Amino acid sequence: MSAPEDLLLELGCEELPAREQMPLQDAATGIIGQLLDAAGLQFGSIHGYVTPRRLALWIKDVSRQSLPQETLRRGPLVARARDAQGKPTAAAEGFARSCGVSLDDLLTLETEKGPVLAWREVGTAQDSHALLPEIASRLVTSLPLRKRMRWGAGSDSFLRPVRWLLLRQGGQVLDWKMFGLDAGGESFGHRVHHPQAVRISTPAGYAGSLLQAKVMVDFAERRAHISGKMAALADEMAVTPILPEALLDEITGLNEWPVVLAGSFAADYLRVPEEALITVMMQHQRYVPLRGRNERLVPHYLFAANLHSRDTQVVIDGNNRVLRARLADAAFFWDQDRQISLQTRRAALAGVLFQDGLGSILDKTVRLQELAAALSPQFAVDAGDMNRAAALCKSDLLSGLVGEFPELQGIMGGHYARHDGENNRVATAIAQHYLPSGRDDEIPADAHGQCLAIADKLDTLCGFFAIGKVPTGDRDPFALRRAALGVLRIVLDAGVPLNLDEAVTRTLAAYGGAFARNRTEIRSAILDFFQDRMRVYFREEGFRADQIAAVLSRQPHEPLDARQRLEALALFQAEHAAADALAALIKRINNLLRKEVISGDWPIDPQYFMDPVENTLWDYWQALEQPLHAQLAERRYTAALGLLAGLRPAVDQFFDGVMVLAEDPVLRQNRLALLARLQEAFLRIADFSQLQGA
């Protein structure tokens, strides 16, 4: 058998979207491994490469022959293989004939339906050169692309038009045809610095050959290069770069041969709010803003050019011109927008549709006024401030700056509110009320912003659920999952004891009689949706599914309280050796009480205790009851569980010493009533019967 050889696959294409490059590389490395496994080809490590113009895979030590593929074929039941006279049936003979063997050569295989006739076929090993072209094509068609393109006369599709193919194992170029192209043994270098073909002699030499052709194919190495060069240049300039991970990834995805340079703009533009300047630089130009030692923006920025110019100043001047035009627009809108107050703009919101069936944006602000003011006590903020902030929070949607840069909604509203003379509390609430807009965004830092943000998200959630615009499967066109997650994150991270049932009920009430559907049904659907989000959120925080089920069955509507119970329960189970035994004991109590009926609020009468163990448990409970209820009232669940854990010896003795289901109905009711007290205490924290091992 030939020794294994490295495999190299490359698709050369038009510029790939920067944000989709790493997901594409990750998907390709995962899929190629699955395809090689399925084909019976053994292999070593997989290295993925991606640049704006290529996706490549280097797989080490791919075997030259596949492992023999074994196929197990199943035939008729053994009981139906012969007739009453012992002669083979037509079904049995037909199966043997299809396998190319005699009936006596067939195997017997045990199955759920009983023993069946079977035949195990072992295929022959195949040459990897014959298998790999088909594997390469299947890789391309299996990639989970957001959108596929077709070009020319062919039917093959990819994220961008493909211009060349490369498929080589060891020293052999393989016969791969796709996109109307034949794979060769060549790649191509940098579009400007080395547009000629680059001969790739071996898979291991791929990255080095392209480096000589001015292409850094390794995304991680290219990223580290850009980060290091920017840090060094910023250090020389005595500034600090504003370089989030996502921006660094995007810059990396825009460049094959990154050269880091510094540009500048007129200091007069610094009068524009820095959020607008940062948005223009980062999100529209992919430039890196800079802060000086006083933490304020400076009129300089960093950027990566995708080439090494003989005259770098020409490149810098070109980027400066582009940025100057964008900043001039921002400054113009900033000056113009402040001439009209948010209050004046508000009336025009009546002409801006929020959603069919839910009225205008002005209607939404009216609902938010009512809801934010109602929620204000839970955030310890003034209802008047919240009413005012809610009234004005959407007015900046009609401003020129937000029209040009929609991502500044809310943020610019806060600046305009301050300019209009609104107090800082109102301005801050307006500025922060869209947060968190993404999974990794910070929540509003101020209680006023938190209150208005939750009101805004609840109004959206309740409205869309009411008109039947509910997320289904992977589809969530109105980002309702994100809105629900935003509510949960604010409540949990800010420590707000919000009751979702009450909040949703109040939100639906603010819509008045606008809905044809039954409001109770809408409310139930929204609360179920929140419960699903809580399960996912708490799982991501590391809690077990059974712990979450145990807690949410008792506290489904207060996320903060639910998390406090979860933390106490998880700690209790981790630190108490007898936690599982206690849970099993509680399950036994639950089972008894589920089968028996306790007459009303049956009082416990010690005169009916027939055994000392009953007195022991009753005395322990009486001593425990008051401090336990005090801990539960203060939501000190860890301390409460510690107290309840002390019940276990007395409960064990109780079950060992008495027959709970005594024939005497008075004794039986007395004992069941005592157990019901214990059950009720545990249920005030969680349903322990849902815990694993209980």
UniProtKB/Swiss-Prot annotation:
Chain segments annotated as coiled-coil in the UniProt record: none
Entry's Gene Ontology cellular component terms: cytosol
KW GTP-binding (keyword) present: no
Enzyme Commission no: 6.1.1.14
Predominant place of localization: cytoplasm
Source species, domain of life: Bacteria
GO biological process, one term: glycyl-tRNA aminoacylation
Compartments where located: Cytoplasm
UniProt xrefs under NCBIfam families: glyS
Sequence similarity: Belongs to the class-II aminoacyl-tRNA synthetase family.
Assembly notes: Tetramer of two alpha and two beta subunits.
Name of the protein in its database record: Glycine--tRNA ligase beta subunit
Organism per entry: Acidithiobacillus ferrooxidans (strain ATCC 23270 / DSM 14882 / CIP 104768 / NCIMB 8455)
Protein encoded by which gene: glyS
